[in-house]
Amino acid sequence: MIDQFERLPGIGPRTAQRLALHLLRQPEDQIRAFAEALLAARSQVGQCQTCFHLSAEPLCDICRDGTRCDQLLCVVADSRDLLALERTREYKGRYHVLGGLISPMDGIGPDMLQIPSLIQRVDRDGISEVILALTPSVEGDTTSLYLARLLKPFTQVSRIAYGLPVGSELEYADEVTLTRALEGRRAMQ
């Protein structure tokens, strides 16, 4: 059981051991309920037909929300990124989940992601702006450049700004982060 927990992202050996020991101390009915919840989630949760976010319904809550701005589309690599943006409660547009990033080193090409559906969606729905919210990595930059080139004939394309986290010290920031922070600077209001 410890080995299975260690396979989860962010779970190291000590945490895996703690989780396993905790479960072994639980009554059998609670363990059964936990196992059934895992199996039910796996069988009942799929992808939204429009944006490819996780959903138990054909359309996710965000795609069903009539108050969202239909002209603004934020592209993310996966549902974790979408959920992180939603936690800000600032973005009011729609999303498109790619299902990963272009990574030739890992054998992931554009055809393995939800890129064709993105192009169709932008063209079909008359999206006025696509916001690329992809990680500042080699794969994220590659995917962003690829998408920008494909989407510019159809719509305005922007990318979220990157910079220093709130409360951080300049002396500890790496050169790439500082460069992007300088490039993404804004006038004081």
UniProtKB/Swiss-Prot annotation:
InterPro entries on file: DNA_Rcmb_RecR (IPR000093), Rcmb_RecR (IPR023627), Rcmb_RecR_Znf (IPR015967), TOPRIM_dom (IPR006171), TOPRIM_RecR (IPR034137)
UniProt key word Protein biosynthesis: no
GO MF entries: DNA binding; zinc ion binding
Pfam families tied to this protein: RecR_C (PF21175), RecR_HhH (PF21176), RecR_ZnF (PF02132), Toprim_4 (PF13662)
Signal peptide, first to last residue: none
Residues covered by the Toprim domain: 71-165
Superkingdom of source: Bacteria
Sorted UniProt keywords: DNA damage, DNA recombination, DNA repair, Metal-binding, Zinc, Zinc-finger
GO biological process, one term: DNA recombination
C4-type zinc finger locations on the chain: 48-63
HAMAP family according to UniProt: RecR
Cited function: May play a role in DNA repair. It seems to be involved in an RecBC-independent recombinational process of DNA repair. It may act with RecF and RecO.
Similarity comment: family membership: Belongs to the RecR family.
Protein name, per record: Recombination protein RecR
Gene encoding the protein: recR
